[in-house]
């Protein structure tokens, strides 16, 4: 509306694009930059991965195991939990947790351990007893059917494949599919009370700040806790001003 308003206290509570069907709208970050504040590039977090290959034959199949985000043979982060195969890549809580560690312009791989409760040798022993019943009863039947093409591999190699199945990560899904955005107003620009150092009596709360937690309600908690922190600071300031 281009109207001008005057206020004693301003709170920046603009949120983010996470979960919004309208896609990316960086006007909130443009406002911060106009105020000469440091903005960390926003990026979807707690979001699904695009992968190669895409295992469309397993679409809708969930699997429990241990999942590792790798780069150059180095484990960036590992999650134990559940993964969901989709028609674009992978989803599930474990995948969303791993996405928190994703950075642009990096080449990541996702390694799936379908048998994380068994050591390599224990799995070899189980496989040697399967003979004609290849993986039947050991994995979801669709996953077992998918791995049928590897049944002629030596048991040692097959066991390794099942404990280190690799998918190349092609990227993360867009902001509209994310639960939260990482990036935003740098914490270097705010005080302990979330007051802008450059602009006294201006505060920032919630997802506009460069704070992003893991799954489990941590981001909702931060939104509420940051609002409470600012409310306390404002109350103190008003009390001091009026005393």
Give the location of each predicted region.
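Glycine-rich loop(s) and the adjacent beta-strand/alpha-helix scaffold that form part
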Residues: 9-55
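An anion/pyrophosphate-binding glycine-rich loop and adjacent beta-alpha core
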Residues: 37-43, 47-155
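Glycine-centered tight beta-turn/hairpin loop motif at sheet-sheet or coil-to-beta transitions
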Residues: 1-2, 74
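Conserved mid-domain beta->alpha element of the FAD-binding
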Residues: 100-104, 124, 131, 201-203, ...
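Glycine-rich phosphate/pyrophosphate-binding beta-alpha loops
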Residues: 19, 48-49, 91-93, 180, ...
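Short hydrophobic core segments
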Residues: 4-23, 32-33, 83-88, 202-204, ...
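A conserved FAD-binding loop/helix module that cradles the flavin
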Residues: 20-31, 35, 196, 210-239
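A glycine-rich dinucleotide-binding beta-alpha-beta segment and adjacent secondary-structure elements
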Residues: 145-212
């Amino acid at each position: 509306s281009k109207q001008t308003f005057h206020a004693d206290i301003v709170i920046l509570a603009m949120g983010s694009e996470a979960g919004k069907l309208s896609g990316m709208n960086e006007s909130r970050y443009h406002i911060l930059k106009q105020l000469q504040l440091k903005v960390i590039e926003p990026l979807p977090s707690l979001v699904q991965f695009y992968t190669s290959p895409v295992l469309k034959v397993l679409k809708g199949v969930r699997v429990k195991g241990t999942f590792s985000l790798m780069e150059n043979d180095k484990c960036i982060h590992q999650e134990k939990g559940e993964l969901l195969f989709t028609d674009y890549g992978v989803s599930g809580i474990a995948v969303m947790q791993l996405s928190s560690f994703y950075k642009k312009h990096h080449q990541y791989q996702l390694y799936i351990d379908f048998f994380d409760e068994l050591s390599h040798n224990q799995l070899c022993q189980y496989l040697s007893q399967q003979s004609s019943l290849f993986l039947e009863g050991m994995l979801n039947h669709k996953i077992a059917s998918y791995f049928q093409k590897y049944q002629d591999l030596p048991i040692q190699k097959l066991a390794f494949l099942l404990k280190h199945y690799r998918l190349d990560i092609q990227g993360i899904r867009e902001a509209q599919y994310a639960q939260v955005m990482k990036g935003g107003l740098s914490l270097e620009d705010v005080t302990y009370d979330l007051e802008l150092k450059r602009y006294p009596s201006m505060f920032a709360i919630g997802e506009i700040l460069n704070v992003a937690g893991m799954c489990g309600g941590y981001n909702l908690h931060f939104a509420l806790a940051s609002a409470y922190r600012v409310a306390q600071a404002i109350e103190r300031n008003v009390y001091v001003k009026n005393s």
